[in-house]
């Protein structure tokens, strides 16, 4: 079939789909990934919270120790976070964020019996936070976080793929009737890691990464309901921009067009630890990374979800006589660039760091001003809809 015919059919299919309401909000089945990315604005992570765990190498199913009385709150707070309150989430929405990323270690409270059965109490606690964030009008992104790394390092590929399918099936079924503001992100930073004691060639590694993402998409779609058209985020190779923009990384095939994003993390650690933040090389590196993503994904109709990017730059890590001086100025620089490239920037944050979960506000007034300005600019930016549905639908497929 010619590309033009496929694209015409795909566009007609999308336009004919009705919007469907559900008990917890609206499911717009005609919502495309690019439109969703625009609506997601600026985001923040609920970091060191539901992805927190105490490792247990002897537990081959959960990979985690039992903490305290084995309640969800024991794990939610084990890395220093406070219990997530309604007021905390209200403050996130009021600060101008449009997206809350909730990383989750699903092995917490899981029995070591090889069934990979998620704890009903644990997923119910995650659901409480998701419900509150959705009620506040936020997009919510949940994933498999750190648990993917445990599985990959301790089990052979086929067992990992089966376990991932089992875990994602449970998550997807729990949230199958949720609205389109709930987005699933497959994994965190572990794709590309081999099992301990083994080695993979470059081609084998990319194949493993691609199989993991395909298993995620296939599993979620098979649960039906609103998941049949939900926006999904495929995770990059280590979420590394250089590795993920390589042609060997393939976006998963999907049963519906234009419902996929790709996830990477903006990591400028080398400049941070070499005390080069704010200099010309740091600025050029940031631009070069954005250009790689634009050429590989955005220009091909695939939105880029930057699931973690730096929120605070300490003064001691700046270059002498920086061109971009001060943490808030660097934040402005990175968020402005993300907005210009139409990426979804999500700040990495932990308890009482950038955003205070006890005071329920952004800790710095100058940082708050940056978030307000960038969020407003994204919201007011004219968006014309699907830029390249045809290329996206045919991306990495034989025609």
Regions found by a protein language model. Give the residues of each.
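N-terminal carbohydrate-binding accessory modules
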Residues: 24-99
